[in-house]
Amino acid sequence: MRARYGVPLKVTAGVAAVGAAGLVYAAGFEARSFRLRRVTVPVLPHGTRPVRVLQVSDVHMVAGQRKKRAWLQSLAGLRPDFVVNTGDNLSDPDAIPELLDALGPLLDYPGVYVFGSNDYYGPTLRNPARYLIEKVQGRHGLNGNAPVVGAVHNEWERIRDAFDASGWLNLTNTRGRLKVDGLEIAFTGLDDPHIKRDRYERVAGGPETDADLSVGVVHAPYLRSLDAFTADGYPLILAGHTHGGQLCIPFYGALVTNCDLDTDRVKGLSTHRAGGHTAHLHVSAGCGTSRYTPVRFACPPEATLLTLTPQD
């Protein structure tokens, strides 16, 4: 039997079945198939020992995500020298207690953090095709994800207060320092460029000359932020936000980044050039999704253990 336009019903049914199976895999398996990415970055002074940095990003915690909570808790077993949290911790305003429980063991380590839009505001239902439409139109998310009228305001202050109480440094449009095994590591952070909360003018001026390493930290890797950090001479920039593309095509990669960063650098370690300088850039694919699109394909959720080593 043939359906309209001469397409056999068996073919139509087969395509539908494959699509359904893919959706089940993307939501039921891959979105919960947590991985640890390991990278080495040569940015430390000569003669220093390696430093282990755990980057956690885009947790997007939803109530009831027991497997994610257990996996995040297990990361403390890596015994990092410090933790960097690059934001978007929530996708459910009622999940703050579970988020803090999941991150509890990591809060025992030194750390720094910035927030993303989903820390401040609850997610809104959005047609996933809009990401592709914005890319085709050349907007690439440049208008940001400014909260719509009626958006849920998260109790983000509870997260901030818990992080601060643990000793983590709040890098919201400001600077901070950690001392790690005798090394002075300076950080400069920005609030989320995706909703235009970044204020680079407050922190401009380049790395601190008496620090052994200076690191730029931001949630969304918009080019204006990457350009500013790099042109000022920061050797390392850490970001999240992109979800690695979230729905990728095998052997091709990501279709979108949800910002103006190119898809070749949607996740992992790369470089960025601006103002005559080159910086190492690490973009985390994150370990969560929006509660309204709880799927990943060819892009498993992850955290990253960065081993910082002496420069060549």
Where are these regions (language model features)?
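Acidic/histidine-rich helix-loop elements
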Residues: P50-R69, L90-D92, Y121-L132, F251-D262, ...
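N-terminal active-site segment of His-dependent metallophosphoesterases
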Residues: T12-G14, V18-A102
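Active-site neighborhood of phospho(di)ester-bond hydrolases with catalytic His/Asp-centered motifs
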Residues: L54-S57, F82-D88, G111-S117, L171-N173, ...
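Membrane-penetrating hydrophobic segments
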Residues: M1-V15
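Core catalytic region of metal-dependent phosphoesterases/phosphodiesterases
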Residues: K67-K179
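Active-site environment of divalent metal-dependent phosphoester hydrolases
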Residues: M61-R66, L90-D94, N118-L125, A146-P147, ...
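Conserved beta-sheet core of the metallophosphoesterase superfamily
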Residues: P221-T304
